[in-house]
Each structure stands twice: as structure tokens, then as C-alpha cells.
């Protein structure tokens, strides 16, 4: 069975987790074997959306219903996600990369290091310029940080320059990028990080 790298994608509701995964998969699926696990509180809506998008065959997507605490399912008790990983591997024994999308949660949510090898945390500009200054653990500890919906900055009075400065304060040299996933702006930086950092380091 192929070694499988697992990347967790977390962030608040509506930040763009699902869209980011869909865009990445669309770019990478032709060159590698990929699966996706979605976490929703009471439904499997994200699983249905991803299946309907056609970016992956249905047998490469599994939806997990987490119940009331989505962060518990990716950290304190990740048993449902571990089971989903095993099921994806049984269905596709060549699988190289699995994305695990967390349910929408607060800035403190982080993935268990036993569940994922790397993590991406995404917020959006519409949540306010101050969000990076709050320094939540999801933003601080993630391997890659994404600030999405840059096109909304003028409408919410947010300075991207200030957000970048604040991000550098709490992340230091850890990578981050701005994106507008509607136009794919910034997507290349995320793909480059996966191809050059995740796979080189994860398979070392």
C-alpha cells in the first residue's frame, strides 16, 4: 500500500475551506492519487457538493458527521476520521494524498498531529482586518496559512498590508499567502507549497 500524506484544512465557517480543497484537487488529481474526507456537524453536505463537482470519483470522497463539536473530531477524539482514512485506503490502495476538511470552527481549532502530517488554516478578509491579531492556535500552529477573499478588502475597510504585517508577527517565517479563490489568485502559492514542501518533506 502506498504511503499516504494527510493534510488537514481548517478554518471558520464560510472562509473557503471547501473551495480551496476543490481547487487544489482539480489541479493535482491528474498527476497523483487523491482522496478527501469532509467533516460536517449534522449533515454530509460538503461531501455531496464535492461529489457533484466531479473533481474526484465518488469512491474517493467520504463525509463524516461529527456531531456538536467539530474540533473534537479532528483532535481529542479523531476516531471517525481515522476510520474514514482506513476506508479510503481500502477503496483505493494507491492513494497518495488525503485532504481532511474540518467542520467550520473557531480560531483555536487545530488538528491532532496523529491525524494529519501537515495542516492549512484559512480565514477570509470579510471577518475583519483584526483577525490575524487575535492569534488563534489554528493560525499560529498551521503549516500554511491562507487569507482568502482579498477582493472584499475595500468593502470591509481591511488593509491587506496590515493583515500581512500582523501575520508575520505571530507566524514569523512560516509560510502564508493571500487568495481570491474565485479567480484563483494565490492558488499557485498553495500548490507550490504542497508540491515542493509537503511531498519532499513528507516522503523524506
From Swiss-Prot:
Gene Ontology biological-process entries: urea catabolic process
A GO molecular function held by the record: GTPase activity
Protein origin, superkingdom: Bacteria
Record InterPro entries: CobW/HypB/UreG_nucleotide-bd (IPR003495), P-loop_NTPase (IPR027417), UreG (IPR004400)
Subcellular location field: Cytoplasm
Keywords per UniProt: Chaperone, Cytoplasm, GTP-binding, Nickel insertion, Nucleotide-binding
Cellular-component GO terms for this entry: cytoplasm
Pfam families the UniProt entry points to: cobW (PF02492)
Binding site for GTP: 11-18
NCBIfam families the record matches: ureG
Summary of subunit composition and partner proteins: Homodimer. UreD, UreF and UreG form a complex that acts as a GTP-hydrolysis-dependent molecular chaperone, activating the urease apoprotein by helping to assemble the nickel containing metallocenter of UreC. The UreE protein probably delivers the nickel.
HAMAP family referenced in this protein's UniProt entry, alphabetically: UreG (MF_01389)
Assigned protein family: Belongs to the SIMIBI class G3E GTPase family. UreG subfamily.
Job description of the protein: Facilitates the functional incorporation of the urease nickel metallocenter. This process requires GTP hydrolysis, probably effectuated by UreG.
Matching PANTHER family: UREASE ACCESSORY PROTEIN G
Name of this chain's protein: Urease accessory protein UreG
Origin species: Staphylococcus xylosus
Amino acid at each position: 500500500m502506498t504511503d499516504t500524506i494527510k493534510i488537514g484544512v481548517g478554518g471558520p465557517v464560510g472562509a473557503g475551506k471547501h473551495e480551496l480543497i476543490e481547487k487544489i484537487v482539480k489541479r493535482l488529481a491528474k498527476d497523483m492519487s487523491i482522496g478527501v474526507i469532509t467533516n460536517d456537524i449534522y449533515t454530509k453536505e460538503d461531501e455531496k457538493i464535492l461529489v457533484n463537482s466531479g473533481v474526484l470519483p465518488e469512491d474517493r470522497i467520504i463525509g463524516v458527521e461529527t456531531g456538536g463539536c467539530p474540533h473534537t473530531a479532528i483532535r481529542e477524539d479523531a476516531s471517525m476520521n481515522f476510520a474514514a482514512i482506513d476506508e479510503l485506503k481500502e477503496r483505493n490502495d494507491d492513494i497518495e494524498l488525503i485532504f481532511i476538511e474540518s467542520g467550520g470552527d473557531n480560531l483555536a481549532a487545530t488538528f491532532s498531529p496523529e491525524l494529519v502530517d501537515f495542516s492549512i488554516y484559512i480565514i477570509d478578509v470579510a471577518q475583519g482586518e483584526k483577525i490575524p491579531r487575535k492569534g488563534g492556535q489554528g493560525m499560529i500552529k498551521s503549516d500554511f496559512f491562507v487569507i482568502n477573499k482579498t477582493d472584499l478588502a475595500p468593502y470591509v475597510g481591511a488593509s491587506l498590508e496590515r493583515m500581512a504585517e500582523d501575520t508575520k508577527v505571530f507566524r514569523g517565517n512560516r509560510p502564508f499567502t493571500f487568495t481570491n479563490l474565485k479567480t484563483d489568485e494565490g492558488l499557485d502559492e498553495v500548490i507550490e507549497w504542497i508540491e515542493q514542501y509537503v511531498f519532499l518533506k513528507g516522503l523524506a
